[in-house]
From Swiss-Prot:
The N-terminal unstructured half of Pup provides a signal required to initiate unfolding and degradation by the proteasome but is not needed for pupylation, while the C-terminal helical half of Pup interacts with ARC to target proteins to the proteasome. Residues 1-10 have a biased composition (Gly residues). Pathway: Protein degradation; proteasomal Pup-dependent pathway. Protein modifier that is covalently attached to lysine residues of substrate proteins, thereby targeting them for proteasomal degradation. The tagging system is termed pupylation. The lineage of its organism: Bacteria, Bacillati, Actinomycetota, Actinomycetes, Frankiales. This is Prokaryotic ubiquitin-like protein Pup. InterPro entries: Ubiquitin-like_Pup. The gene is pup. It comes from Frankia alni (strain DSM 45986 / CECT 9034 / ACN14a). There is a cross-link at E72 (Isoglutamyl lysine isopeptide (Glu-Lys) (interchain with K-? in acceptor proteins)). Residues 31-41 have a biased composition (Basic and acidic residues). Belongs to the prokaryotic ubiquitin-like protein family. Residues 28-66 are annotated as: ARC ATPase binding.
Length: 72
């Protein structure tokens, strides 16, 4: 009796290639996410530095302005 090859091995190879591509895409996403995180961290640090500078120069005026705008 003759046996027939269903080509299942080839499908396994294709699935493996798909998994490799998926992992590579996830790696790119992680890299993009890391870059965004670093950029946002830099922006936040810059903003905090600017606030510190304003407070060092005229903290009393800053507080008066805050209270006048409804702050407590």
């Amino acid at each position: 009796m003759a046996t027939r090859d269903s080509g299942g091995g080839q499908q396994h190879t294709n699935r493996h290639a798909d998994e490799v591509e998926e992992v590579a895409a996830e790696g790119n996403d992680a890299s993009d996410l890391k870059e965004r995180h670093e950029k946002l961290s830099e922006d936040v640090d810059s903003l905090l530095d600017e606030i510190d500078d304003v407070l060092e120069e005229n903290a009393e005026e800053f507080v008066k302005g805050y209270v006048q705008k409804g702050g407590e």
